[in-house]
């Protein structure tokens, strides 16, 4: 609302006349509290030679409710002009001492109130010119938990993620992802420094608090370059209206930063439904848990999402949460592929039947179409829908880039991963992913440099494993073995153990691979064992018929690795020339 600008200029004019700011506080949060909850100090109390009528003018300009402020700057100026005429009209008689004193001050600074108004309007022009026309990028820092109860962290984190999700629907706005902003939780870094690291124009910070059935969000917007407070507001609603509140805050932000919002985006930011309080609380707890990415927490998250749906069977976000959780379980090899894919499809379709604009649900469907259906045109359509509804969701760009790599469209993949890095600049996964792209593009030396840089910043399984694969391609077996050992140390589990066994086999020491293979085959007669590790061990031992036989089983189970291997350099050569492998790749659709 343009009346926010009236308020801002009121602050400037107040300071120009009194030499003081209208709202006081010993520290930043105290000033914000004063802005949101207290009336400004009377101008006449600060400078007793000012006319009392100015108190009324400032009271209106600085009103908490925008509806109570002047509608236009012209109206503001008109009241100042009227005040001047009122004082000028007293020239014929003896002016009150107070008016005389004020008039002298005005004459001193420019020759009367007309000059002051001219100065005010000039200051307004400069003030508004100084403000950026639009803010194109923003970071929502983790909202503070003002309940001081650690058990309520899930609520503050959930509200942070909700605001990121809502703002991410605006195509013209680059919104930094959750992964990067959560690194600043409880950070004491100055806001301009944070903004510089994230490369954003503005920072949104604030707090979230729940007391009984009421929720309160305090939000403030800071311009990154100048560290200037652009806007601050307090929002309070019943818990059942939490979805309305999230959209209300997001609308206020988009209005303040003057970003271009399409009619469809505006509709999304204006449409919400009441939600069962217990259902949403369970949903937030589930979301909090699945973001920890451990098997235990993922399964606990499922239980909370299911609890939410028992309270509200039409709660689309809970269905999306379930779909995303099974997606994570699938790619972490913690669920049988067919079971995971069936759950992903069921929950994503249910979510979209309630709300077709859920970008995250479209992203899950893209994985189903790619891995389960081998429908690659359909996969790309779902990726595009996901980006249409959530254009600042970095995970979509990341998986879309993976898909492009596996389809052999490397240049497009690199463009997508660059976009993901703009949204999620501090993600260690994305920093290392560019090394994986270079590996698939056979640029091994560049990939080694990139991955080593990332490992120096944050040791992790993915980069160590990719670096090991590169060394295998360069026949640097001792270096590869060292990388896979580190991957095991970082928590890579049985998959990293398999990689290490394969590396030893290529180095002419097949004993570990044979022992591991024998153990897995023995286990598979008693319980489910993923065929992924078995076929790769056969491959490393040079037993291609057995390798392809187990790869065919992996394809039957719809293992994601079937899509990933065709463009992977390490599987070229003997495997690619095997007739049954060629037949399988044609069936999948990777060979025309």
Predicted regions located by residue number:
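Short, low-complexity patches enriched in S/T/P/G
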Residues: 95-110
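Single-pass transmembrane signal-anchor helices and their membrane-water interface zones
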Residues: 110-131, 136
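Catalytic-center loop of serine/cysteine hydrolases
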Residues: 125-128, 134, 162-304
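A structural "domain/chain start" motif
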Residues: 129-157
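Glycine-centered tight turns that cap/initiate beta-strands
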Residues: 169-172, 314, 580
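Short coil/linker segments at helix-helix boundaries
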Residues: 279-394, 398-408, 425-429, 433-436, ...
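Alpha-helical protein-protein interaction modules
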Residues: 382-384, 395-398, 404-592
